[in-house]
Structures are given as structure tokens and as C-alpha cells.
Amino acid sequence: MTGEDERIEMEIRKRNGESVPFQQEKIFNAMKKAFDGQGKEIGSREMDEILATVLNNLSVTVPLTVERVQDEVERTLMERGHYEVAKAYILYREKRSALRRVRHTIARTVGDDSLDEVLRRIQMDFTEEVYSLAALQMKFESFCRLGMTEDERAEALTKAAVELTTAEAPKWEFIAARLLNHSFRCRNAQEWEGRGVCDLYGKLRYLTDKGLYGDYILAHYTHEEIAMAEDFLCPERDELFTYSGLDLLLKRYVIQSRSRVPLETPQEMFLGIALHLAMNEDSDRMGWVKRFYDMLSRMEVTMATPTMSNARKPYHQLSSCFVDTVPDSLDGIYRSLDNFAKVSKFGGGMGMYFGKVRAAGSTIRGFQGAAGGVIRWIRLVNDTAVAVDQLGMRQGAVAVYLDAWHRDLPEFLQLRTNNGDDRMKAHDVFPAVCYPDLFWRLAEENIDAPWHLMCPHEILTVKGYALEDYWGTEWEKRYLDCVNDPRIEKRSVTVKDIVRLVLRSAVETGTPFAFNRDSVNHMNPNGHTGMIYCSNLCTEIAQNMAPIEHISTEVHTENGDTIVVTATRPGEFVVCNLASLSLGNLPVEDEAYMERTVETAIRALDNVIDLNFYPLEYARLTNQKYRSIGLGVSGYHHMLAKRGIHWESDKHLAFTDAVFELINYAAVKADTALAREKGRYALFEGSDWQTGAYFEKRGYTSEKWRALAKTVAVQGMRNAYLLAVAPTSSTSILSGTSAGIDPIMKKFFLEEKKGSMLPRVAPELSMDTWWYYKAAHLIDQSWSVRAAGLRQRHIDQAQSMNLYITNDYSMRQVLRLYLEAWRAGVKTIYYVRSKALEVETCESCSS
């Protein structure tokens, strides 16, 4: 624009009454757009002449208003013969005027003038006709009633946007989120204004004094550091939320007063978590606070639900799941029940291995037929899960595991079915079976072969060893030795009998989960120090286990008081610290970006180990010995659909293989660097990491991998276990992506919640992604199994992998999927989700 040297200093009154400096560039740009919109070319000289005429005529106008400027532009264009451009400019003005009118009408009806700016941003960001605010106004007015308060009208406006969400107009869920966020922020600002608090430090001081925030945050950070952290906040990232995600976060994740009033914003929540996770960093602590905050607030990484909920709070139990080995003794069983109760009290889920507990009819102190079997004890576990309900929020959650050769297996497989003796049922636990390779081999080659069920206590008594302590060929040799020993009582059935019970229960109840014990232990990077008997509640954890053992009970006298001291050997009580990469929100093709993101997530998870509040000392000791973590993924189907990759395609298989190899490489690289900085885990020597067997078993033979293996051998590893893919049912909603590694259930559906219907939309649903979102029950499950097998090579632990079947599936077809998974090296199978079956989701492992 050539007339800048002749700038006229004036003020213009905006429509809201505010006076601001007049910017003639805006007139120039508006006219230029009008000419461009009509496909008309205009020389710079003529444009300057038009602008000069407009400015000259405006210079005598007092006061100068927006409408007066636009009137003068129209008049000048017509005087110079540009009628079509002037007409287009007039129509454009009318359209803008209509947009303003609908905004003002909605804001006035709600009674909130500040809403106008939110609506203006919505109009700018959602320009398609299907997202017209006129439709929102019409729906909103149908909800309005006489006597409604301003808050009720704001809630009705949000509800209107929610109900406009359809498969054809999915972005209304983002508009609804903005409206919800505006209402929340207005109320939140009023809450803090009423308390006389105006900055982040003041908020943290108040929350700490009220016992809602852990005092350790302000003890570790100075006032200046908190002020620096406040500058990291990016409120605009709230616009990444869908309505479902923001609604869930405000109801369950942000800190609330004791009267259930939310007291922190979503961004303050992410920052609070980051402050906690970086608390003990020695160097560049504020830099790590920012990196942790950025990965969380950009929704590129989600921490597990306990970490998201409890970080920054006084009781900061950050771990998701725990796994206990139940001993075969009265004291041991009740200790395990007590452990479960304490874990459940603080929101953790539990896996319990019952494979060492003697079967029904076994001996007790030599008395024949005295043992009641595992079912009676599992019923106590069931009642504990119901009784310890986390302050009335939700009941405890536990998976109980039993070996496929245990004599109580037939009754165990009917724990949750609807027929049979109710005294032998436990409907609130999740049964899971530990299968040896021999079982699947017989199911594939000779399903009518005999299968012998035995009591582990009887084997230990007769043979002097515990059969469950072995795996692979050594287990097979000892199993056959027991089968051929007439001193050991057998309950002989066929493989087909067990398969039939397993599949019937799976189709009817979704369980038992499957744990392929030989595959797990063969690929265990820490097999030099122990064995893995079972997995956790959600079947993604595979870590060394050992039962807690009673050593002695002694009586002492101290200061005249009698003290009873019980000594125990802590065993290996498994702990899961989880987080997930949101693959749908990440540039997975960008190797450098992925490596940096994985490095940040690994460091955050490692910090959880030292910062955690442990409900049990056994858990703390095991976690600090192995320093195990579980980095997983969510948004798997989201990632594929965004890239135009069909689930049922070879391209899917090749892509997932490449992505998970990249994730694993980045994780190992980050972890060994962390070991160099902070020290290796205690049992590194002799592990597959140290010997190189970890890399050999997975076929990592490229130059890049060989170089990394050498580095690991020298530097060590910070964490004994690295990767585990959890279900992420809740946190995937927060981050607006698909759950875990599952395909979506439907492109669009309505979920009934507290009397209203909430729309659920596939992530980033559009005409570009529509045909790549195939519903889970319509997918050929063999593609899912093959993909799981490829991923499993790169995952040192396991995956929460579901099978989706319809009523058309035969038992033989379901068995074929189990066999295919076993052959592919898949370590675990979570639910078998029949289309007609509702199954419960694990919130503890949601990451």
C-alpha cells in the first residue's frame, strides 16, 4: 500500500463503544478481498486513489464509527463504477451483520456479554454452513424456560451444541466444549475472586492450606518458580478438548473442594501434574516442568488415571495396577486379601495369581479332603472388591488367574456364568487362565487328547517341586512326569472339554482373559532373576513375581510394652506405572519428534517411581528394585484413519510394525541415557538387556539396533521393563482419540448418561476418514490378531488386546482366533467382546 506515508491519525469507535486507533490497512485489505472475490484485477495506483478518497471523506467525520467507514467504502466504489464489487461488499457486510446479530441474541438471552467473543471465535473457526450459530440459537431457544438462571441458560446452550452433534456435523462436540469451558471459566474466576486470589501461587497456597494440594509442591518450588510456571500456561489449548473429554475432566480429574466445586482449570491441572513429576529433577527442573506440561496439554501423552487424578494431591498414589502371588497358606491368603483391600482403597486395580493355592479336596496337615479349593477364597476376594469401594466412588477391581492344569479349573471357568450353583459364583471378579504352549498345541493338533488337572500342593508334597515354577520344555517334562506318577491324583478330561468351557464363558461373559505363560516367560528380559506367573487386571503387565513369605513372629518388650514383631520376606509385588502416547495426535512419521516425546514420557514415568505414595511397602520395594514402567499407546485406529490406512490391509500391518519399532527404539535409547544420568536398575547384570539376548530374540539386527545394544550393555538400563499397552478407556476420551489399540465401536452413537443422550463421534470424523473407520464387530479379527503379533515383537510386556465377535461366530472360529494369537506370539487376550455383551472397563489402567 503506497499511501502509508500519508497515514491519517484518527480514532474509531468500535461497535462495543470502545475507541481504538484507526488502521487504514484494514480498509485496504477489505477492498482488496472484495476485488479478488469478484475475480477483478485493480492496479495499485487506482487502489491508492480509492483509499485516498475514502480517507479524505472520513477525515471530517466525528465521531468515526465502523458503520460510517463501511458506508464510505461502498459509496466510493460505486462512484468509481465498481458496481459488482460494491454489491459484493454490501452482501459481505450484510452477512457479517447477520453473524453479529445471532451472536448478540444468544449472548443477551444467556445474560453473559463476555460470551460474544467466544461465539465470534466459533464463527471464525467453524465456517461451514452446518455449524451456523443460527441452528444453535434455534435449538437453544427450544430449551429455554421462564425463570431459568444464567447458569441454567448457559448449560442449556451447551446442551444445544451437544445435541447438534451428528455423524454429518461432528465438530459440534468441539463447539460444545468451548461453550462448556467458557461457563466453567466464568464460575471458576468468580470462585477465586471471592477468595481474593489472583495468581497461581495464591491458588496453590490456598489449596495447600485447605489440604487439597500436597504441601510438597510449595516446599520444592520457590514463589519465583511458580510464577515462571504460570507463564507456561496456554489457555488456548483448552480448544483441543471435545465436549466428552472436557466434561469428564471437570467432573473427575481437576481438584475439587469438599463440596465438589472444581477449583483448578484444565491447564492448571496439567501444570500441577508437571510440577509434581519434575519435582526431584536436579538440573533444568523448570525446563522439564515445561516439557511435561507441553506433552500433557497438547494431548500427545496421557498419564494413567491414578497419576492424572492424584499427582499434586496429599495422597499421591500414582500407580495403576498391582499384581500379587497368593501363597498356599491361611496367613498368606489373608495377607493377599489385606493387600488387595489397601490397593483398592487408593484406587488401584489388582491381579492375583491363585495357581499355588491347593485344590478342593486336597489335604490340610495330612487330613484328606479338607481343603475347600480356590473358589471359596475367590469369593472372599469378590466380597472385598465390593466392600472397599474407594470412598463410594466405584468398587474395587480384580482379575484372578489360575493355571490351565489346576484341578479347580472347571469350576473356576464358571465363576461368572449365569447357570449353576450360585454359591460357586463370583460375579465381581474377572477370571483369567494361564495357558502353557502344550495346551494350545494339543488344541490345534489333537483336541480330543487327554488333559490332566492336578493340585499344586499335592505335586509339591509328592515330587518336591512346584510345577507352576517352570515354563517351556522344562514345564512340559515335569508335567508329563506328574501325569505318569500314580501317587498324584488326576482329574482327567479332554482338551476339548476345557476349550468348550473357556469359549462358552468367553462368549457369555467376555472372560476368562488369556495369559500365554510360555510366550511371556520366553521373552522376559529379566528371566535371570525370576518368573512371571500371570498378568494384571487389564492383561498388559508382565513382570517378575514372587509370593510374600512369613519368616518369623517374635515378642519383644520395649519400655515396659509388649511388642509383637512379624518378619516377612517381601517377595516381588508387581506395580504398574503407566502412560500412553496418543498416536492419533502425534506425527508418528517424524522420527526426531517421536524420540523427543518418548524420552519425555519415559522420564516422567521413571520419576513416578520415586514420587509415588505406595499403599504397601511390598509394592515400594519391588518398584524400586526393578523400576518397571509401562509406556503404551492410545489413538491407534485414529492414527490409521488419519493416514488413509484400512484396518484390513497389508499396509496396516507394515505401518504398525514400523511405528512400534520406532517407539521401542526411542524408549530403549531414552532409558539407557537415563541410566547413564541417574543409574541403572539393581538387577541389570545378567538380564537380556545386558547380554544382548533381548535384541537377538526380537531380530533387531540392523546397524542402528546393534549400536544401541552395545550402548545398553555398557550403560545399563534405568528400568527393567519399558512398554505395556493399556486399554486407556477414560484417558482416550480426555485426549479426544480412540481407545488403546482397539478399533472404534461405531463411527457415531448416542450414549445414555444420567437421563440424557451423549453423542460419541470417531476422532476427526470427516469425508476423508469416514471409510477408514470400520466398526470393531465388522472387522475380520484375524487382521487384529496379526497386527497384535507384529506389535508384540516390539513390546517387552503385553497388550490389552480385545477380540470382537458377533452372534454369527461359531466356537471353532473363536478357537481359531486364540490359536492364531498364540502362534503369532501374542502374550495375552483381554476381553472377548460379543456384540450383544456389555463388559466393564478398567479405569485404573486407563492411561
Describe each PLM feature range:
Residues 222-234, 238-247, 539-543, 605, ...:
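Catalytic alpha/beta core of large soluble enzyme barrels
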Residues 18-22, 42-45, 110, 261-264, ...:
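Alpha-helix capping and helix-loop boundary segments enriched in small/acidic/polar residues
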Residues 255, 261, 270-285, 289, ...:
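Function-dense linear segments that define catalytic or interfacial modules
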Residues 295, 313, 337, 597-620, ...:
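Internal maturation/activation junctions in enzymes
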Residues 2-8, 18, 44-271, 287-293:
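Core nucleic-acid recognition elements
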Residues 23-41, 115-129, 271-278, 739-744:
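Short, surface-exposed, low-complexity cationic segments
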Residues 88-95, 102, 172-204, 435, ...:
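Terminal amphipathic helices with adjacent charged low-complexity linkers/tails
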Residues 189-283, 366-380, 392-396, 401-536, ...:
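Conserved, charged catalytic cores of large soluble enzymes
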